[in-house]
Amino acid sequence: MNRRTLLKTAGAAGMLACLPGKPTAFAAEGKSGGDATSVKTDIYRLKLRHTWTTTMSSSTYRDVLYVHYDHGGISGVGEGAPIVRYKEDAKGAQAAVNSVLPMLDSSDPTQFEKVISEVFARVPGQWAGKAAIDIALMDWMGKKLGIPLYEYFGLDQKDAPVTDFSIGIDTPAITREKVKEAAAFPILKIKVGLDTDEQTIAAVRSVSDKPLRVDANEGWTDREVAARKIDWLSKQNVQFVEQPMPADRIDDLRWLHERASLPLMGDESCRHPADIPKLVGVFDALNFKLDKTGGMTQTYMMIQMARALGFKTMLGCMVSSSCSITAAAHLSPLVDYADLDGNLLIANDPYRGVTVKDGQLILPNRPGLGLLPA
């Protein structure tokens, strides 16, 4: 099912009837189809400050894809961070983007919805590659209009939420050091999902009493064990538990939701617009990531769908540079929670964009993404 068919189907079901109109690119004056277009891709290796470990993987670096879109004298840049969970990598994302370069070269970027829908129709999977194209075109459009992207989406930068800071799975000693390094952040997100979960939380609690958000990354496979862990976490000043069990265990997740003593948030369970209505009664909140959904425009629509169905919402991220994190931050005034710290986990960020002061996201007010070279 393509994007337009899905939107029509959802509308017929009444799911989108109460949503505000999706921003479109038709606000740009004039046509740009006659101007020269150049689209280039490159892979960049991000070096992590600490080894990053979850139940999914462990790494000291992450390769990301950049898409550079130039048209009519205006340049846009987008980033995609491929997700190992979905068997994506940077080379695959680059090949996917390169496969639609002729279409992008001949398209009018002011017809934004048409271009992105065509990309989605032509490229199977490779959501990070799609996100890189989408973000580059959005950056271009904001610069074309001379406005920051939060303004393009009709949002108020003052409504941007506080972001947490993520602590990956590690030894108790290193966990304590990571928590101390995150002293400026009022909320911490703790990765769990192993047999050492209680030691991890104990290590955090030995040096901090801050509110925690706990992410199991599908790591708990026994629902009874998950329920007991959540009950224990409810006494540890935890706000919610993210993706406690595998995404395909919907019946077990629903059972757990009925008994959980903390709110549950879905992440891996929520990838596409059609997933959202199926998760009513399974989760209290949903986590959206540009690399998982395919970019800013799809994420905007999915957040609005989730809100209409009564979910709390969060914008999360992969390990990324300030390009992708700033793109997500421009949408953050829409959501209840933010986990936008991927750029703070790396040592070689090539860009400057969104900044953080005591956990508060501060959006750039320059046109487009508002990026500057590092």
What are these regions (language model features)?
Residues T5-A27:
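N-terminal export signals
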Residues K8, G14, T37-L46, V64, ...:
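Flexible C-terminal active-site loop/helix
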Residues G21-T55, T60, D70:
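C-terminal segment of N-terminal export signals and the immediately downstream linker at the start
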Residues G33-T41, Y69-D70, S75-K144:
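Metal- or metallocofactor-binding catalytic centers and their adjacent structured scaffolds
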Residues V67, G73, I133, G146, ...:
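Conserved, mostly hydrophobic/aromatic
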Residues E151-A260:
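Metal-dependent enolase-superfamily TIM-barrel catalytic cores that perform enediolate-based chemistry
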Residues A184-P186, S208-K210, W232-V238, H257-L264, ...:
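Glycine-enriched alpha-helix->loop->beta-strand junction motifs that scaffold or abut catalytic
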Residues D252, C270-L340:
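Catalytic alpha/beta core domains of metabolic enzymes, predominantly
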